[in-house]
Structure formats: C-alpha cells, structure tokens
C-alpha cells in the first residue's frame, strides 16, 4: 500500500525541507514573538526552500506568523508558489502530506508522531525538537536512528532560546 502512496511529487517542489507545526511548538521559549523572525532568517541562510505545514492550527504563535499562508485547496491557483523561498501550506490531505514528506531533503517537527514516523519510514533526514525529559519515551517508538536527530527545546526544565534551536537547525541543514 505505501509503496504506491508517496512517489508522485505532485507539487513539483525541488530542494526543500518541511517543518510541520502543531501545538507542540507552544512550549518553546519566545515562540509567539520570535518564530517568524527565525524562520525568515533560516530561509536566507540555507540553500533550500522551506515549506511549513500545519493542520487547523489555531495557536497564537501560528497566528502571529506573517509568512504567506496558502490553503492546500488553493495552492494550484497560486502561480508564484514555486518561486517562494518560504511559505506555509495549510491543511494538506494525508496522501499529499506523505508526498511532501517523501520528496523532501529534511523533515522537522516537535515530534508530530505521524510526520516523524513517515519520515523515518522513508529513511529521510529527520529532526525532532523535544524536551530532554521526553526523549527516553519518544525513543521507545523510534527504530531507524540513522537519519534521526534530536534538538532540545529544554534541558532539565530550562527552556532553550529559539535562537539556539535555529542555529542547530541551520547547521544540520547546511551539513546535508
């Protein structure tokens, strides 16, 4: 079933990373005020397109993003989407979501379960942004560690600054 599920590249995007955003971003220090700035900075410092995905996201940090938000149903109407360096693709259906994951260079999330496991199933580079105290539990579900990396958003209950998290992401992306 999965063998025929994900190989279409219906979007025709090339050389991109996917960052999936959900409620697990909410506990990152200064995310409501600073996330937009660091996403735009990252897009300038790497040689890849950034496609941000989210589904029905009503969180304040997400509402505060000024990055272009394109609903999946409208992406074909948005002719300049291929030229955008960073954009948000909202409410992507499951099949197309798998397609985005499969054709990416790197997938990043705060352990969005399905997203992480599909990325690892495809043996793709994956960054999981976790609280250090969650890592042991999460690792019970991670079998393919060859392409799996963790970046902490907190250690010993001390939140890590968003700037430090994005510096680590930038380093990993540029080392691909």
Region spans (language model):
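A nucleotide-sugar donor-handling region in carbohydrate enzymes
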Residues: 1-16, 27
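Short, flexible helical or helix-coil boundary motifs
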Residues: 9, 46, 79, 173-176
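Short loop/turn segments at strand-loop or loop-helix junctions that form parts
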Residues: 18-23, 54-55
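A short, glycine/small-residue-rich beta-strand->loop->alpha-helix junction that serves as a flexible
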Residues: 24-33
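Donor-binding and catalytic core of enzymes assembling or modifying cell-surface/extracellular glycoconjugates
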Residues: 34-136
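Nucleotide-sugar donor-binding patch of glycosyltransferase catalytic domains
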Residues: 116-176
